[in-house]
Amino acid sequence: MNNAEQVKVWDPLVRIFHWSLVAAFAVAYFSSEDEWLGLHSVAGYIVLALVLFRLVWGFVGPRHARFSDFLYRPSVVMQYLKQVLSFRAPRYIGHNPAGGAMIVALLASLLITTVFGLAVYGAEEGAGPLAAALAGVSKSRAHALEEIHEFFANFTVVLIFAHVAGVVLESLLHRENLVRAMFTGYKRAGE
């Protein structure tokens, strides 16, 4: 495929965000034991910073990075999923309706995970930006915060598996390597 047949879709900041988030979440998830708390906390702060960046970039970034380019009504998302299941889904240059919904779900789940992570860090370790607000919280409440944090971390993993499955399915359906596109920024031009 030559450059004349390709179109730039993913800007460098979206690509750096995506792969940095993959790495930071993996480090945070797999360093969740007490002996790795320092690494877990740093990775969690990085995840939070990346999510906050992406929320801003969703309003001020280039066309395909903007939420306005890929947020659809739930009925449109459901119709698109039906088309995927019948192998008749149209191809999108940017995010398709299901991909847009997944981005919102992932960002929301990651934001909840990190905010509750900060709460756990403050309540159990007396550290972080919420330490003063959560000083003296009972062990049962601290445990509840930790349960919520862990639930959303695990829910995020479920979303990640669904996201990867969607990327593989779309890649096969449209004969296009979407993983490569997230590295290079380029996709095949419209048909």
Question: What are the roles of these predicted feature ranges?
Answer:
Residues 1-191:
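Membrane-embedded alpha-helical bundles that constitute the cytochrome b-like, heme-associated redox core
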